[in-house]
């Protein structure tokens, strides 16, 4: 490897191996499983990720003829096969999307039901929502939440079954208006707190040191024109905007659309005015990549 370049040489085929991951990375685990499924011999992956999406992938691959054992555990065994065949498989519900809407309901003191969802996949999130004051009711493949006065709670992201890093930013938006002082610790990714400055622009009181955010809850946030820098921070800004009594415009929805389908239409069911608008107005915010504009229309969300 030379700086940002990777030099590789193609081999005629892959062979099984014993691999131990330094950290239980979801992407690395998925990639290794898919490669090992068609490799010659046995592959053993230790310290593998245990996220539900890993288990779902393994179930589909096994339907296609793969031989994968113990998915969902820290040690996964794969016996390579010569070929795979087609199958029909229903992907599990998106737990991160479901969690985002539950957090949005808590932030706006709303009552909603999210379905279909697998409640066990969100146990860590549901526990924190209950701890922060919301009432949670689980019935089969649905979760109902009734938002209440928000209390400050501490969270620390962790691999599954811990609190998911993908819901750290939305939950921080919730904690900005909680009563009391909370602490959010990010242990999975570096530089995943770029939403802190944006939330502070809206009136929150967050102090960031390394990977730990200390939050003093405020009574309300103010509406702003802001630009989401990535998928989860965009969702967090919109949740924060929903709690404001004034109008907010959130841009950079090309990030949001990667992970959420019809996001604003679904959020409108919370009883809040939110809609997608088209504007040719230039954005002056320094954190926006102006190369994306190219004199094209820019999409934003209006929440009030």
Task: Pin down the residues of each PLM region.
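Structural preference for solvent-exposed beta-strand-turn elements
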Residues: 1-304
